From Swiss-Prot:
Disulfide bonds join 13-118. GO terms for molecular function: actin monomer binding. Phosphorylated by MAP kinases. Belongs to the profilin family. Binds to actin and affects the structure of the cytoskeleton. At high concentrations, profilin prevents the polymerization of actin, whereas it enhances it at low concentrations. The variability of the residues taking part of IgE-binding epitopes might be responsible of the difference in cross-reactivity among olive pollen cultivars, and between distantly related pollen species, leading to a variable range of allergy reactions among atopic patients. This is Profilin-2.
């Protein structure tokens, strides 16, 4: 399966049981910051933003004082799973980033999608990729 199909079919799809509710943007990005696939709405990010995210996976808590920045948007870092998932909140929306062996699975949401729904969509694909050795 092509990487774009993972984004289109598994991240930007309707949320289970909530027809018409979906993430506002999603991407799969390599650990080096190269974009493997993304939705048309995924923000253009700076290399230093991706470096900060990768540092937080290696040194959990790194982003907590400054926030998570992606595409010029600042998210307040909320509970995650050290070395596995980073979650951020901004107003009525937020972001979930799941690290796999080779990539970051990113999902951005706004209401009516809930944080839990975004987590489920992003982490389910991330877990699948981990199971595949990716």
């Amino acid at each position: 399966m092509l990487w774009q199909a993972y984004v289109d079919d598994h991240l930007m799809c309707d949320i289970e049981g909530h027809e018409g509710h979906r993430l506002t943007a999603a991407a799969i990005v390599g650990h080096d910051g190269s974009v493997w696939a993304q939705s048309a709405t995924f923000p253009q990010f700076k290399p230093e933003e991706m470096n900060g995210i990768m540092t937080d996976f290696n040194e959990p808590g790194h982003l907590a004082p400054t926030g998570l920045h992606l595409g010029g948007t600042k998210y307040m870092v909320i509970q995650g799973e050290a070395g596995a998932v980073i979650r951020g909140k901004k107003g009525s929306g937020g972001i979930t980033i799941k690290e796999t062996g080779q990539a970051l699975v990113c999902g951005i949401y706004k209401e009516p999608v809930t944080p839990g729904q975004c987590n489920m969509v992003v982490e389910r694909l991330g877990d699948y990729l981990l199971e595949q050795g990716l």
